[in-house]
């Protein structure tokens, strides 16, 4: 068995990636989220596959097919709610995973980091298109509002929107293509994950100290397989509490009303994991400006390696940067809250202040704090 594991062409790759992989001896539980994301992706692909067997991508039957899955299909309700809440779990792990990368300086592994950003965009696109499929009120109006943002692009905007819609409004053609893309994208994500891991294993993992891990490595199995398993059990516990006790906690009641192009919901909002970006979008009165701010709020991650001015890689021994990091975290919570509120006073002002703070922290305050900490090292 030992020989097969180390010599067989396919087994050898698996062995070098998950069993005999040299891993830093001091990585904490914040490093668990990569494997949890893999588990989430697997769950989403499996549950999605079973949902696709019963779903119909047609405007007249989409809503009733989802109702049919919940009522008539054996365990259809749990598959549907696992898929819906699995997306929330996915984004929760994703945000923590990115936060850990920022805190411990993992963005210095630029290839891995950049593939991660591409993965983030792809997952966001997949989640958005998945939200449209049940064809409830929020599905329809969410699709209309978000796709309409592309019309802010000069010259080609309107044509681009109509091209995406497949007509002059969100209709059957839009739903069909969104289903097709929603089905194929998770497999593209899985391929990108392999590239992400490929680049990571070229350099090896970072560790909480931000120092080179070469001096002390341990095999991934059994140490980190057991550790990841504990994380997985906790994730399953959280997911099951959501699915079995309050499956609609993170959803929108409006999505239990079939899509009606003639009646607009009082407050159009996306799922909770997009609310921070939605708040930034709404905080700018100009349409093009809002769209640019929305894209920048995520694309800003790409320039973080350039903005890294500190002499130390990790924030572990940098109190000023730590303080700003947690301020940024709090700011993102505020933006998430504001994104779910109606557009009225005082929410508009709070949203604008939080949006300005978000960009100021990343672009100005954090690099400045790092420079001050560099000076403090000499004292």
Swiss-Prot record:
Heme b b566 binds at residues 97, 196. Binds 2 heme b groups non-covalently. It is found in: Mitochondrion inner membrane. The chain crosses the membrane at residues 33-53, 77-98, 113-133, 178-198, 226-246, 288-308, 320-340, 347-367. The keyword Transport applies. GO terms for biological process: mitochondrial electron transport, ubiquinol to cytochrome c. One of its GO terms (cellular component) is respiratory chain complex III. A ubiquinone binds at residue 201. Keywords: Electron transport, Heme, Iron, Membrane, Metal-binding, Mitochondrion, Mitochondrion inner membrane, Respiratory chain, Transmembrane, Transmembrane helix, Transport, Ubiquinone. Pfam families: Cytochrom_B_C, Cytochrome_B. One of its GO terms (molecular function) is metal ion binding. Its cofactor is heme b. Heme b b562 binds at residues 83, 182. SUPFAM superfamilies: a domain/subunit of cytochrome bc1 complex (Ubiquinol-cytochrome c reductase) (SSF81648), Transmembrane di-heme cytochromes (SSF81342). It is a multi-pass membrane protein. The cytochrome bc1 complex contains 11 subunits: 3 respiratory subunits (MT-CYB, CYC1 and UQCRFS1), 2 core proteins (UQCRC1 and UQCRC2) and 6 low-molecular weight proteins (UQCRH/QCR6, UQCRB/QCR7, UQCRQ/QCR8, UQCR10/QCR9, UQCR11/QCR10 and a cleavage product of UQCRFS1). This cytochrome bc1 complex then forms a dimer. Heme 1 (or BL or b562) is low-potential and absorbs at about 562 nm, and heme 2 (or BH or b566) is high-potential and absorbs at about 566 nm. Component of the ubiquinol-cytochrome c reductase complex (complex III or cytochrome b-c1 complex) that is part of the mitochondrial respiratory chain. The b-c1 complex mediates electron transfer from ubiquinol to cytochrome c. Contributes to the generation of a proton gradient across the mitochondrial membrane that is then used for ATP synthesis. Belongs to the cytochrome b family. This is Cytochrome b.
